[in-house]
């Protein structure tokens, strides 16, 4: 990845963020997309070879189907993890 990306971490997930002068400014991409796939599979993603990880936003990972071009999103955290993260923020 390009060194112009900003590296950030939120709720234990490391992201690359597009620079402000990019048309994709602010878009977050996981540093390790395999983690996004593993999480999505755990939450019900079928046929992972048919999907591309695209980006993350609002605590969800977004995937695009290779064939249909449809998007699908999966939450990054379950209910228990969301509660833990909210207490950490306080």
Where are these regions (language model features)?
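Short, low-complexity N-terminal segments with a bias toward positive charge
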Residues: 1-19
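Non-Sec secretion/translocation targeting segments of pathogen effectors
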Residues: 88-90
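Acidic, low-complexity, intrinsically disordered interaction modules
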Residues: 13, 17-86
């Amino acid at each position: 990845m390009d060194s112009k990306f900003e590296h950030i971490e939120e709720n234990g997930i490391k992201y690359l963020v597009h620079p402000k002068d990019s048309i994709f400014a602010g878009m977050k991409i996981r540093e390790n997309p395999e983690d996004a796939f593993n999480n999505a599979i755990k939450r019900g993603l079928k046929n992972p070879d048919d999907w591309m990880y695209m980006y993350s936003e609002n605590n969800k990972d977004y995937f695009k189907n290779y064939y249909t071009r449809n998007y699908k999103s999966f939450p990054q955290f379950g209910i228990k993890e969301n509660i833990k993260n909210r207490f950490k923020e306080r």
